[in-house]
C-alpha cells in the first residue's frame, strides 16, 4: 500500500513503552513513502531518541497532573489550553493527513488540536488498563486500537508493535529444544532497573546454586551494588550489566525471564517466545498486572505480585520448571503474540488518512 505524499504526525512521549511502538509504526510507513513528523516534549526521552531515527520532532510544553499539588491543578486548564494552541499551530503548518496517538501527556493536547482541525485521530493503547489521556481521546478518535483485551470494551486488539530484531528470532523449538546445562535466567527491571529484583535475585541465586546461570540488568547506577550482592551470596559468577543494548540477543540467550511487566516488555517476551516470571510494578490501577495476565492465562508465565514476592517464592517457581515445561511455556508465549502488530496499526493509519 503506497503512502506516497501522505503525512503522518506521531504523538508519543515520556517512556519507551510509548515511544518505541510509535517508532516501529513510523518506520513501517516511511518505507511506504509516508512523510512522518513527531510531536513530543523537549525534556523527555523522545527529544533525543526520535531525531536519531531520522524523524523531525516538534515540541509542546505539557506535563502530567497526577500527584501534583493544588496550585498545579488550578493552573492545569491554562497549561492544557496553551499546549493545545502550540500543537494546533504546529499541525496547521505541517498539515498531516492523520495523527497517531501512542500515549503520554503530549497526546492529549495534540489529539484535541488535530480534532479541532478536522484531522483524523488514530489511537493505540499499549497497556491492559487505558491511560487517562487515551480515555479522553477515545471519545473523539476515528479509530481506537488496544494491545491487550480490556483497556477499552469495543476496541480492536492488535498487539504492541515490537522491534524487528525481536520478531526475527528463531522459534522456541529451534532455540531451546537442544539446550542442556544450567537454566539461563534473564533478569530485567526495565531501563530504570527494579530495586526489588536487585535485592531478591542474588539470594535466589544462592538457593538455586549451579542449576541456574543469571544475566541481570540492574538499571542505571546499580551495577556495582548488585555485583556485590551476588558476591556476598557466594554467587560471583553471574553477569550483571547496567543496560542491555541488544535485547534480541539477550532474549535469544535466555531460557526464562524474570522481570517487570511493562506493556512493551510483555509484548516482546511473547514475540520472542519466552516463559516469564512477572513481578508487576505496584501501580494503583495494577496496570502491569493486567498487562501480564493474558500470558499467565495462556500458560506461558506466572505472576508474583510484589506483596507476595519472596526469595522462596521465586526460587521455588524457577526450580519447579523443567526444560520441557519451559519449552512448552515458550511455545505458548509465541502463540499468544501478535507478530504483525506494526502492520495492523499502520494499516489503520492508512485507512483513516484515505477516509
Curated annotation (Swiss-Prot):
It is found in: Cell inner membrane. GO terms for molecular function: UDP-N-acetyl-D-glucosamine:N-acetylmuramoyl-L-alanyl-D-glutamyl-meso-2,6-diaminopimelyl-D-alanyl-D-alanine-diphosphoundecaprenol 4-beta-N-acetylglucosaminlytransferase activity; undecaprenyldiphospho-muramoylpentapeptide beta-N-acetylglucosaminyltransferase activity. GO terms for cellular component: plasma membrane. It comes from the Bacteria. Its EC number is 2.4.1.227. UDP-N-acetyl-alpha-D-glucosamine binds at residues 15-17, 127, 163, 191, 244, 263-268, 288. HAMAP family: MurG. This is UDP-N-acetylglucosamine--N-acetylmuramyl-(pentapeptide) pyrophosphoryl-undecaprenol N-acetylglucosamine transferase.
